[in-house]
Amino acid sequence: MDYLQKKSIRSVAAAIAGFLRHCVRKIGITREKLPSCIALAVCPLVTFYLFEMYTHNPFTTMHFKTQILNMAFYVLTALLLFGIVKYVRVALMLQTAFFMAAGLANYYVLNFRSAPIMPWDIYSIGTAASVAGNFNYTLKGSTVLVIIGFLILLLIESRFHMKTPARVAKRAALILLSMALIYGYTGMVQSESFVRNFGLYDKLFTPTVMNKRDGNIVAFLMELEYMDVEKPSGYSPEETGSKYTQAGQDSAGLTAAVEDPESVKRSNIIVIMDEAFSDLAVRGDFTTNEDYMPFIHRLQQGAENTRTGYLNVSVLGGNTANTEFEFLTGNTIGFLPQGSVAYQQYVQKETPSLASYLKELDYHTVAIHPYYASGWDRDRVYPLLGFDEFLSQDDFTNPKRIRNYISDESSFAKIIELYENKKEGEPLFVFNVTMQNHSGYEEEFHNFTPDITVDGIDSKALSMYLSLVKQTDSALQGLIDYFSQADEDTMIVFFGDHQPTTYVSNPILRNNKVNPETLTDEENLLKYKVPYVIWSNFDIEEQTDGETSANYLAMDVLENCDLPLPALQSSLTGLRKEYPVISAAGVREADGTLTTVKQCGEALNDYRSLEYYLLFDYER
């Protein structure tokens, strides 16, 4: 431990010790009050350890100095509560009950989406509640023991009866000092110099590791700093707006196409972002009783008028809306706070997107999501992105269901229905976000029996997931078969929004002798890869080894449809050659080097400025 680290620890310890001495003097410790004072110092520490044990063993994942750092917060909040509620037992029991409930919630969230609770999840409560009934809430034995530990602690805390000083001034002093120290503590753990000198783990794109190493509270407070999007260095809305306008003017054929849409070829464009669809073979080798995606695997071997490859996305196991945000807008989540949901936080006005651009070309733009319309605020956001129409589960009549969700087969049938009933001569753009493959994967259902098994791996979740993927593969084949016979030129774009939560894929890693807890940066990036397919019933150049990211994929769609690129995509053509993959999970340089958005720094500043402008300063 270097000098600065030791100095940081001593500073924290000295501040808290001085504060406690002040409290002792003000309260006036007597023999009767001594047990309560000890409880006020010790019980918060027990609460800390129990809270961490919901998800990991802090004695093995956290340095002792980091444990001390976390304990300080618990002691300070206990003192603050003591000042507010007057009774030590009430203060301690309130703190313990809160962390017992919050820890259990964090345990479930981590299991369901492979990421802990983060500050931005407050925006997602409604969406989470809508799918809450589809998960398995069985507790592990170790988790039950943690809950029992909390209950015992609550019982012990109920026996202490010390009150705060009767004088209002002393209580106020205790409250104000506690608040001041908590405020200072928060600022300290958000300080880059403290994080660096203390040795905290600050890789926000791996929040699970961050929580295990830094502790849940310290990690949460560090993440709070990123609630707001900082302006890029040297940002000027006037200058950036001028660059954006110029990029549109420089895009070959864009102005003419917008002024006279009939002057360009306008094929129907169908985009399917399939829920949790991925090929877990990218994580490691495994053998199944039969191919779980035979149709897509055949396309990946090479097919006429077909382009296949892998898409790098910014999310894992959840936050679906961020992948659609990247695809539709051309922006990247990599410039936004880790864990944020762009739809709910940043799309508050009309925002340029693929839908709004195609609408300018007189396309009829339709979004489909066969679940609740309010999920991720889609019913509010889609009109702002330029969609003419939004069809949710309420617009399906007697659809086929797999488990509790509308099947991909029925979801794709809705696309065919739209095509067959569209106005003659009006091109159609459909963006379909499916639900069939949504987690969880451990329940049994009367209407679906998994038929894929994995040799040497006994995992109900993995078997369920691969069996669902097979259903999607079959539905996609049916859709492409239909449009291969269609009279109008049509392109179908298919990709997954993210891989499933890691409890599905971890058995594959372990079967390949890979520890999921000690992945290299390259291995970690594999968690963010999903396959994509671009197919058309007209001539396009074939490809089988594509590697891109969600923010760039719409460029491929437009270019292969012979449509001009809109302003943002036009401005990114040069950058894409230097950085063919940009996501929150990682950046791939042209020579194959893996880096991060943060490490790229000024190299991405023009892109960052354009994104900031479009989200916060752009006006149509």
PLM region spans:
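Transmembrane and membrane-interface helices of multi-pass
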Residues: D2-M210
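Solvent-exposed, charged interface segments at domain starts and junctions
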Residues: R21-C37, T127-V131, V146-E192, G234, ...
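Short alpha-helical interface patches
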Residues: R113, D121-G133, G141-L145, M222-E225, ...
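General structural signal for secondary-structure boundaries
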Residues: R113-P119, Y137-G141, S233-A247, T320, ...
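Alpha-helix initiation and N-capping motif
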Residues: I122-I125, D214-F220, M293, A321-E324, ...
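Membrane-interface segments at or immediately adjacent to transmembrane helices
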Residues: T186-V271
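Solvent-exposed soluble domains appended to multi-pass membrane proteins
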Residues: A252-V264, M273-D274, D279-R620
